[in-house]
Amino acid sequence: MTAPSDFNSIPELDATLVFRVAYDGSSYSGFAEQPGQTTVAGELRRAIETLLRRPIVLTCAGRTDAGVHAVAQYISVPVTDAELALTRRRWLRAMDALLPKDIAINEVYKARKGFSARFDARSRTYTYRIADRDARPVLSRGAVWWHRYPLDVEAMSAACPALLGEQDFKSFCKVASAVGKPTHRCVMRAEFGHEVAFGEDILTFSIEGNAFLHSMVRTIVGTLVEIGMHRREPEWMREVIDACDRTAAGPTAPACGLTFMGVDYDPAELVVLD
C-alpha cells in the first residue's frame, strides 16, 4: 500500500475505483514506492493525485520486483461519490497524458467501499518467458530470458506437479523477506507452453496461486531450468520444497522474463466505469 502525499485534507471516501494497469518494468525499481527510486506506484500515484487534486492511498494486487513487467496489474484507490462522476473516457485520456509511455491504465472499474485489489484477489497469475536457443531474440528481447541453450521441457513439466497445492514455499523466497513471516502459499496451476512473439518461438511457464513470496516465481523458474539442463532430476523439486531452505533451490531467474498476467476477482465486485 502506498501512503498518501502531504496535501491538505482527505475527504470522506465512499467508494473505490479499481484500475487495470500494464507496464514495462525495465526502467523501474519495482512496483512499490522507495525513497529516491523511480517506481511504478510512484508514477501512478502522481498521475492520479494530479487529476483528483488530493492525496490518495493506492493498493496493488501484487508488488512486482525491479525489471518485472505486467499486462494486468490491478490497483485500488478509495474515492468520493463525486469522483465517481469522472467518466471512463476522462480517466483513460488523463492517465495517457500524465503517465510515462511505459505505463498504461487500460480499464477503470467501480467497486464497493473497502474493496482491496490485494485482499479481495482470489488468485494471481504470472508467466515467465524463455528464449532457449542460440539465436538472440530481437523484438521480444525486453520481455524474455535469453537462455542460449535448449531446455528439456518434458523433464521440467514432470517437476511441476510437486508445486501444486498448499505448502511451505520458503525454499523459493528471498531470505530476508522470509524472516518472521508466513511462507505457506497455494499454487493451483504450474505448466509449460509455447507462444510466438514477433515471429520468435518462446517457451512459457505459467503459474497461478493465491499469492506469491518475494522472488518466488523467478526462483521456481531457476530451479526448473536446472532440471531442464539435466543438472538435476525432476524428483529434485520435491526435495527442494521439503528443505524449506533457500540454499536448496536453484538460482533466481532474471527479472526481465517475468510478467504479471492477471488477477482473479469475484466478477460481481467490479463494474466497468461508464
Placement of each model-derived feature along the sequence:
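Structured-RNA-binding interfaces characteristic of tRNA pseudouridine synthases
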Residues: 2-274
